[in-house]
């Protein structure tokens, strides 16, 4: 069945993958973003516009959409506090209020696994309490609560992805890959024993579309199967590259203190979540996923594919 879909944040990392997949379908798709995409796909109606302006100019047309996918967000290392709040909370709330007036539109919100901060239990389950460590996570929690307050429980889904990997993905692991390239030792809190979960951007996009097509309500994690310790991922990468990956251990508490100093001095774009949660295990309960959905890439494949793509371009 063909759907009429509105996608916010269509020029972002996840938005680009969604438009790539959707361009090969029979769905009627409109992608909105304040930036032009680095690549445009056929069969996608791109509009360079803010969400608020789009709502103002197209309020009467919103009820024609079968599915609205809200990926637009200011990331913690790309915006100031007021920008984070304006986009992640205020603008999202404006959209949510309009969606609440629609009868048959299904709404998907891409939240963040950062809402769990340093998880209070492992694996993270449906019952696990939020434990945010930074303002970004707090904005995501606020918007999740706004969705719960305004929308019918049968008409929405919330997705909380683990660390998203893929071609040209920037973040802490691109820093790791750069250190490996130049034979610089990688600081590993907890000796790299922490079990870390990733999700390939293609798998995340497929999960979103699977949930949207089947109107699967609820709150869902996004994480590849078989999470492993970070040290094992790095050792496997070294074997693939035929290169020794240099590492040195750093105490998690010292790692966090150094990180907080960097943050206070504004010499890093990372947040308290990066320094406070990274040294510890973080993965979801493997049984917590929509019925019959299968991830294509395992945790190891997700990490290696992203890493090898980085090194193949050097």
What are these model-predicted stretches?
Residues 131-157:
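Active-site Tyr-X1-5-Lys
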Residues 68, 79-108:
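NAD(P)-cofactor binding segment of oxidoreductase domains
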Residues 117, 159-175:
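Flexible, glycine-rich beta-alpha linker
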Residues 5-25:
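N-terminal Rossmann NAD(P)H-binding glycine-rich loop of SDR-like oxidoreductase domains
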Residues 211-270, 299-314:
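Mid/C-terminal beta-alpha module of Rossmann-like enzyme folds, strongest
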Residues 169-175, 189-212, 218-221:
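Substrate-positioning beta->alpha
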Residues 51-87, 115:
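NAD(P)H-binding glycine-rich loop region in Rossmannoid oxidoreductase-like domains
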Residues 94-135:
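Conserved Rossmann-fold NAD(P)-dependent oxidoreductase catalytic core, especially the SDR/UDP-sugar
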